[in-house]
């Protein structure tokens, strides 16, 4: 019974609301002037994709190959990452050392599905297939973003930080001003 009352009241409310909106007198005039009309809302268009062609896969592969190459010093790799500074060179060297020590080198790369980025239309996204020498982790796929820089391409800072943990890992090399570690006590003998 209660359900029927609710349905009836709900229907009556809807009918009343619709009926009242149609009951205004056609000759009724407002005493105040009509509200000024606002200009139509327009959304600002997204930045259009560049007119230049997308980079060739080889251009992106070259960036990644040089980053993973142990023969290229970290100071020469800084220019391969968006916003990297000379202070990041040591982290880049540690990354390459970790790849070598972990038996991941040599590495090869394949850049697929290259497209303009949805977030920054002047950047490109690519699905990169990384093939390593490591027997247990031979191949993996990772989406990477690249930034146009001085006629070439750089790995985006965000992608570099995810891959290299650059800027998030403390410097593991002792500084010149660090005191030498204390000798461990010798067991009584």
Curated annotation (Swiss-Prot):
Predominant location category: membrane
Subcellular compartments: Cell membrane
Membrane topology, as annotated: Lipid-anchor
Biased composition (Pro residues): 180-189
Record's keyword annotation contains Signal: yes
Transmembrane segments: none
Keyword set includes Ribonucleoprotein: no
Coiled-coil segments: none
Keywords, alphabetical: Cell membrane, Lipoprotein, Membrane, Palmitate, Signal
Signal sequence residues: 1-22
Lipidated residues (N-palmitoyl cysteine): 23
One GO CC term on file: plasma membrane
Name the record gives this protein: Putative lipoprotein LppK
Organism of origin: Mycobacterium bovis (strain ATCC BAA-935 / AF2122/97)
Gene for this chain: lppK
